[in-house]
A protein has these predicted regions:
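Inter-lobe coupling/hinge segments of SF2-like helicase ATPases
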Residues: 13-15, 37, 41-47, 54-251
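Interdomain "pre-motor" coupling segment immediately N-terminal to P-loop NTPase/helicase cores
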Residues: 1-28, 32, 76
Length: 251
């Protein structure tokens, strides 16, 4: 009951930007660049997100799905909706490797579409940081992808409409709040995790978040196996890793 009361109070307190429609960028991507037909689970989640974005209340949604389920694609389409409505978007990842992966993946997906994206991490050069700051303030940068570097005071957006946080459990509520404060009005928030969380537990851990689940893999995707080994099986693990790499797979 306390969680439901908190959720009701949050909806009353925080008004959100209204993204009333999709535009050229979304449609161009959907009809020309979409790498595969969306799964029913992705379509369902997109409907939930679009409903949030058009509700007039701030979206605070947890998107849960296995590695390879298509969370990044859903996140990208959500960002395109924000951009089509005149706003900027950002993705914050816990490591430079993951931020770089998002940057490369999204850049490839957006080939041929006039969307400006940049990468900002702790190792970004001073000249690059200055260019990014200027581009953000002049609204010439649509999507910023990065690590905790996004929280720095000199990173200011002209019109931040959507914040996406990957691997939510590695960030605290205070860090989410710091991204809110980049705007006079709070942006919409979408947080993602590949960690399976039962819905009742998610309500306990993330009572301020609505929950969406992608429970279906895109066609042709091989299910990801999660395995546990004890320390005494270390050599077995190393041998398994070597074999997988030799077969050009990921571990």
């Amino acid at each position: 009951l306390n969680l439901l009361r908190f959720k009701t109070n949050r909806n009353i307190k925080f008004r959100g930007f209204v993204f009333s429609s999709v535009g050229d960028n979304f449609n161009n991507f959907y009809y020309n660049n979409l790498p595969f037909t969306l799964t029913d689970a992705q379509k369902r989640v997109m409907k939930e997100i679009r409903k949030d974005l058009g509700s007039g209340k701030q979206m605070n949604r947890l998107l849960q799905g296995d590695v390879g389920s298509g969370k990044t694609l859903v996140a990208l389409m959500s960002m395109l909706i924000a951009i089509d409505n005149g706003y900027q978007a950002c993705i914050m990842a816990p490591t430079e490797i993951l931020a770089n992966q998002h940057y490369q993946t999204i850049g490839k997906l957006l080939e041929g579409i006039d969307i400006k994206i940049r990468l900002l991490t702790g190792s970004s050069k001073k000249s690059s940081r200055k260019l990014i700051s200027e581009s953000l303030l002049h609204s010439s940068l649509n999507i910023l992808i990065g690590t905790h570097a996004l929280l720095e005071e000199n990173v200011q957006f002209a019109n931040l409409g959507l914040v996406i946080i990957d691997e939510q459990h590695l960030f605290g509520v205070a860090q989410r709040a710091r991204l809110w404060q980049k705007n006079l009005n709070p942006p919409h928030i979408l947080v993602m995790t590949a960690t399976p969380i039962p819905r009742t537990l998610a309500m306990t851990l993330y009572g301020d978040l609505d929950v969406s689940v992608i429970d279906e893999l895109p066609p042709g995707r091989v299910p990801i196996k999660t395995m546990h080994f004890t320390d005494s099986e270390r050599n077995k693990v190393f041998g398994f890793i070597r074999n997988q790499i030799a077969e050009h797979r990921q571990v």
